[in-house]
Amino acid sequence: MADKGERAIKVVAENRKARFNYAIEDTVEAGIALTGTEVKSIRNGKTTIAESYADSKNGEIWLINSNIPEYLQANRFNHEPKRPRKLLLHRKQINKLMGAVDREGMTLIPLKLYFNERGRAKLLLAIAKGKKLHDKRESEKKRDWGREKGRLLRARG
């Protein structure tokens, strides 16, 4: 059994379509301000971040449209499933992210929601630019060609 100091990172939710729909420039790890019932619900593993994005309001970054379902045992003290959640970042990181969004037309999308070694909920946030339809087709062709090339190499030798 692992000791408390040797806890592994546990990925709870992953945005798999993000790498297909966006060209990812940079990633940042951010903490999330959560209530107790939200943490318990995340640990149950029913969270989705596929349709969510991050936006800035009043000099802070907020995670919008993420779905953390209600915790069944919480009764009336439950949280709202799709409420905006504040992301915990340093001021320099916030300025960098807001600058990229304002100047370069980038978007902030979550890639992974996980618990780190200390048991804290963290979000891997990406600065990304949306791909056009022809870019998506091109990346799909590259992926298919890579698979086909691997098959050919395995078949010959």
UniProtKB/Swiss-Prot annotation:
Its main location: cytoplasm. It comes from the Bacteria. InterPro entries: SmpB, SsrA-bd_prot, SsrA-bd_prot_CS. GO terms for molecular function: RNA binding. Signal peptide: none annotated. GO terms for biological process: trans-translation. Transmembrane segments: none annotated. It is found in: Cytoplasm. Residues 133-157 are annotated as: Disordered. Residues 135-151 have a biased composition (Basic and acidic residues). Gene3D superfamilies: 2.40.280.10. One of its GO terms (cellular component) is cytosol. Keywords: Cytoplasm, RNA-binding. Pfam families: SmpB. Required for rescue of stalled ribosomes mediated by trans-translation. Binds to transfer-messenger RNA (tmRNA), required for stable association of tmRNA with ribosomes. tmRNA and SmpB together mimic tRNA shape, replacing the anticodon stem-loop with SmpB. tmRNA is encoded by the ssrA gene; the 2 termini fold to resemble tRNA(Ala) and it encodes a 'tag peptide', a short internal open reading frame. During trans-translation Ala-aminoacylated tmRNA acts like a tRNA, entering the A-site of stalled ribosomes, displacing the stalled mRNA. Belongs to the SmpB family. This is SsrA-binding protein. The gene is smpB.
